[in-house]
Regions:
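Positively charged n-region of N-terminal signal peptides that target proteins for export
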Residues: 1-4
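Short, solvent-exposed loop/hinge segments that bridge or flank secondary-structure elements
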Residues: 47-59
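C-terminal motif of bacterial Sec signal peptides marking the signal peptidase cleavage site
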Residues: 14-17
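Acidic/histidine-rich, surface-exposed loop or edge segments in extracytoplasmic proteins
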Residues: 60-74, 129-133
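Soluble non-cytosolic domains of exported or imported proteins
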Residues: 76-81, 139-142
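Short, well-ordered, aromatic-rich surface patches in folded extracellular/luminal domains
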Residues: 19-44, 103-173
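Charged, amphipathic alpha-helical segments
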Residues: 22-28, 80-107
């Protein structure tokens, strides 16, 4: 009986380390390491369906949500150095290989919620990505996109043309 218990424990120990799920290998980064000449992006963001804020390198424009006062637009061109630093971050997170950005499987719901819509062009390929925190949790990829957007926002907010835009009035509930 002892022998049977020992064999059972050994088998249990061996099989407990195994899993039916296989770890997916990371998607190979197909982005060129150096920033291509056609690299551009646009991100719209805000609360829920009110994604009035926009940073658009295709059009060299920024739109600021003024809440009760509508929106204001400024012509802002990011420098080559700034575009390189943004591209480097996108390359490091393999943004063109991202897939399930929005899905978390959470049953939670909250209002208001953040939402970002991205359009990115790299080396002739265009990628659209959307995520929100409406269902409370976000994927790790969505979290990376949020950090990237905040990084880009910090760059934009240092620009004189952005500083000259009116302040927002009011708030979202």
């Amino acid at each position: 009986m002892k022998r049977l218990c020992i064999i059972f424990i050994i088998i249990l120990c061996i099989t407990s380390g195994c899993s039916w799920k296989t770890n997916q290998p990371p998607i190979a980064n197909s982005m060129p390491q150096e920033m291509p000449g056609d690299f551009n992006f646009m991100v719209r963001f805000g609360y829920g369906e009110v994604t009035k804020n926009e940073i658009n390198s295709y059009e060299d424009q920024v739109v600021k949500d003024l809440i009760n006062k509508g929106t204001a637009t400024a012509d802002i061109t990011l420098t080559t150095e700034e575009m390189h630093s943004i591209y480097k971050k996108m390359y490091e997170m393999n943004v063109m290989g991202m897939k399930d950005v929005a899905f978390t499987g959470s049953n939670c719901s909250k209002i208001p919620y953040n939402e970002d819509n991205w359009k990115i062009t790299v080396d002739g390929e265009m990628k659209s990505l959307t995520w929100s925190d409406q269902h409370c949790d976000v994927t790790s990829e969505a979290d990376q996109l949020l950090k990237l957007r905040k990084f880009i926002q910090q760059i934009v907010e240092t620009k004189e043309a952005y500083k000259e835009l009116p302040e927002a009035e009011g708030g979202y509930e």
